[in-house]
Amino acid sequence: MPEKKITKAIVCPMCGEMSKADVYTSINPSVTKGVRRRALDGELFAWKCPSCGYSARLTYPILYNDMKNRFMVYFIPKIDHFQLCDKELEEKYSNLRNISKRIVPSFNSFKEKIFIFESGLDDMSVELTKLAISQTVSKKLGGAEIHDGYLSMYDRERNTMGFTYFTGEKHTPHVQTARLEIYVKSKKIVDSLAYKDKKLKGFLKIDREWAENILYRYKRMKHIEKLNKLKE
């Protein structure tokens, strides 16, 4: 699938003048040279008013289709659905298997998913790892609230991965690294409890809320196992 774009009318919020902008609905880094960089650094979403020079970053639905690495990330601003089925895409790629398909609500999560899949990682396991480490970070910072967190570093040779969390009232960034053993443990939990999710069709929203549900089920399972042992 090559890139697809449409032209839309844009009204400048500063001067009120109307102009046009190219809006990309689908991009494929394997086909279009340089589009990956333009997507990740925000250039693809940049817009400048030709009348007054006001600059802004447009936010609109866009499908990032990386067939080389076999994943699709659908950025739909502020989407709150867990699952999105696109019949046209499902039919078009019905002969392809093992393609990870995700929906994300923000530009940062869009970039993170691309980084995760390009690194050859399982995003479900990454989300569970991120959640577990965020609890450690919160305790480390005296119970500070953790607002968001993103995978920001992965080094397989050094057996390390790192996350950047935004903490406290000022959303202060905090970088926390961890050994890959935590990720490996998370993957075992995911393989045990999320096997049904892995079989679902369409685009899935795998995020903190999803990870919290998996962690809750895991703790409940362990609690039941403990009670059963006491009864023996």
PLM regions with names:
Residues 1-78:
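N-terminal cysteine/histidine-rich coordination modules
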Residues 4-5, 36-38, 57, 70, ...:
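Arginine residue identity/basic-tract feature
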Residues 6, 10, 27, 62, ...:
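Weak global preference for isoleucine
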Residues 28-32, 85-86, 122, 176, ...:
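Serine/threonine-rich low-complexity intrinsically disordered regions
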Residues 42-45, 90, 126-232:
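Long C-terminal interaction/binding lobes of large macromolecular proteins
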Residues 48-133:
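Domain-exit/linker segments immediately C-terminal to small folded modules
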